[in-house]
């Protein structure tokens, strides 16, 4: 059996991004438990940071009500590229931008920087599809959410 051809799913060349290419930032403190046996932050933690950075920003801006809002965002796609290790104890700056704004979906890109660094240690994205909280069917982005997200493009 031949190995799968990943040439269609893996970019030919991926490079770290500059801090200046992100629109908003949020500080995240690493925890002792984030490190793995190899002495750096485990890959799963990066995905948690992406989610935390975006959702905390949306909540702070008053455009996402996780407890009672009629619209919620569900993650349908995610990916991460790693360029340099991060480890406890470190403060991470998570840069956020919107790469694509659709009718009911958003592609967020998050760059993770060692505090004060100009280039990303990791860069990832995830796509939220916004759905009705009850029936889980896609709905148009609420106007206040869309207005805020446009500032991140």
PLM-predicted stretches and their roles:
Residues 2-60:
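Catalytic strand-loop segment that frames the active site of acyl-thioester-processing enzymes
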Residues 57-106, 120-124:
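Hydrophobic beta-strand-centered segment that forms part of the acyl-chain substrate-binding groove
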Residues 27-31, 81, 127:
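Generic structural detector for well-ordered beta-strands
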Residues 46-49, 74, 109, 127:
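Residue-level recognition of specific faces of alpha-helices
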Residues 2-24, 86-88, 98-153:
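HotDog/MaoC-like acyl-thioester-processing domains
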Residues 34, 40-43, 76-77, 84, ...:
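Generic structural "secondary-structure junction" signal
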């Amino acid at each position: 059996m031949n190995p799968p051809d990943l040439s269609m799913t893996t970019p030919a060349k991926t490079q770290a991004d500059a801090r200046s290419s992100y629109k908003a930032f949020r500080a995240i403190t690493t925890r002792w438990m984030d490190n793995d046996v190899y002495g750096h932050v485990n890959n799963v933690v990066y995905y948690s940071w992406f989610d935390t950075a975006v959702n905390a920003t949306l909540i702070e801006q008053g455009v996402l009500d996780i407890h009672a809002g009629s619209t919620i965002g569900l993650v349908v796609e995610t990916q991460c590229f790693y360029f340099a290790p991060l480890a406890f104890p470190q403060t991470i700056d998570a840069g956020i931008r919107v790469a694509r704004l659709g009718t009911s979906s958003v592609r967020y890109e998050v760059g993770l920087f060692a505090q004060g660094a100009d280039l990303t240690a990791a860069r990832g994205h995830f796509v939220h599809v916004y759905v009705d909280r009850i029936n889980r069917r896609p709905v148009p982005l609420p106007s206040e959410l869309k207005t805020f997200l446009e500032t991140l493009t």
